[in-house]
Amino acid sequence: MIQMQTNLDVADNSGARRVMCIKVLGGSKRKYAHVGDIIVVSVKEAIPRGRVKKGDVMKAVVVRTAKDIRRVDGSVIRFDRNAAVLINNNKEPVGTRIFGPVPRELRAKNHMKIISLAPEVL
């Protein structure tokens, strides 16, 4: 569950290291984002010579959450840390690589480019 002011790791090579959620997209009263949801983030920490710099406001897809993800078969999956992948306005990843595993739930939300770049899909 990601809400405003939540800090997330960045799971791609866009140049950002840490971002902070400043808005959950999908309705004016929406409080929380889950895996596959799009949020607006502010870059809080970035590496030199990256594609993005500190202070940039971008959109991102939540790819890992510390909160449980319940599946239809009754199994539960959770990750150690919250993570997101930065995207542009066309919903394409800014980076060219994705680090770490991503859950299958991204496929249902039509983030196929992220799934194809990920090294492991759980």
From Swiss-Prot:
GO terms for biological process: translation. The keyword rRNA-binding applies. GO terms for cellular component: cytosolic large ribosomal subunit. Signal peptide: none annotated. SUPFAM superfamilies: Ribosomal protein L14. InterPro entries: Ribosomal_uL14, Ribosomal_uL14_bac-type, Ribosomal_uL14_CS, Ribosomal_uL14_sf. Pfam families: Ribosomal_L14. Keywords: Ribonucleoprotein, Ribosomal protein, RNA-binding, rRNA-binding. One of its GO terms (molecular function) is large ribosomal subunit rRNA binding. Belongs to the universal ribosomal protein uL14 family. Part of the 50S ribosomal subunit. Forms a cluster with proteins L3 and L19. In the 70S ribosome, L14 and L19 interact and together make contacts with the 16S rRNA in bridges B5 and B8. Binds to 23S rRNA. Forms part of two intersubunit bridges in the 70S ribosome. NCBIfam families: rplN_bact. This is Large ribosomal subunit protein uL14. It comes from Azorhizobium caulinodans (strain ATCC 43989 / DSM 5975 / JCM 20966 / LMG 6465 / NBRC 14845 / NCIMB 13405 / ORS 571). The gene is rplN.
